Amino acid sequence: MKQPFCIWQDIYVVGSAEISHPYDCCVYLVDAGELVLIDTGAGEGFNRLVGNMLTLGFAPEKLDSVIVTHAHIDHIGALSRFKREYGVKVIAHELEARAIESGDGVGAEFYGVDYQKCSVDMKLEGTEHDFHFDKYDIKTIHIPGHTQGSIAVYADIAGGRVLFGQDIHGPYEVGWGGNPGQAVVSLQKLIDLKADILCEGHFGIYQPSSEVRQYIEGYLYQLEHKIAGER
């Protein structure tokens, strides 16, 4: 396994398929004064995630919250353990809360793992939210398309805008809770944020801003042409 690393001031990768467990999404840690995790991986790599935090000098007991980008197992599998062992607040869009709390539709069967249900402390309504921490504000924006309650997370830190866009690559299939038409609108919203750094859900880090834009536009182009071809 590779080692966790710093992406930008106070932002770290603590999990991924290469860092914590092959089933895991990219798991990001923000030191905003309080520690905030973006997603948790599929659950099998929990101990590795905790160890990676310790390697970087962060005590998991200092975790304040986990922001869930969407309710697929590779992003939420370790939620219940983080909540049970460290008392984190779980933040998710209200449209994802049912899946997180019931386990329905999270896709655990595709990975052959057991999902442990988890209560959601803060169910986000509407489009945008701003969370105030000691050092930084962290913002969320509703971006339906991959799932109905998908959110992106972003923060302005040390002169750069960092976007946790997560599964920009999709899929956007209806069977996974997706909607290609909604995804087109959502991808344009992400482009309009003009991020300097993109922290993607599975494919790592993109920078500078020109590469961020190019990456998102590539998937937007594919979706638009797919939709046009189906008409």
Where are these regions (language model features)?
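Active-site HxH/HxHxD metal-binding segment of metal-dependent hydrolases
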Residues: E44-N47, L54-H129
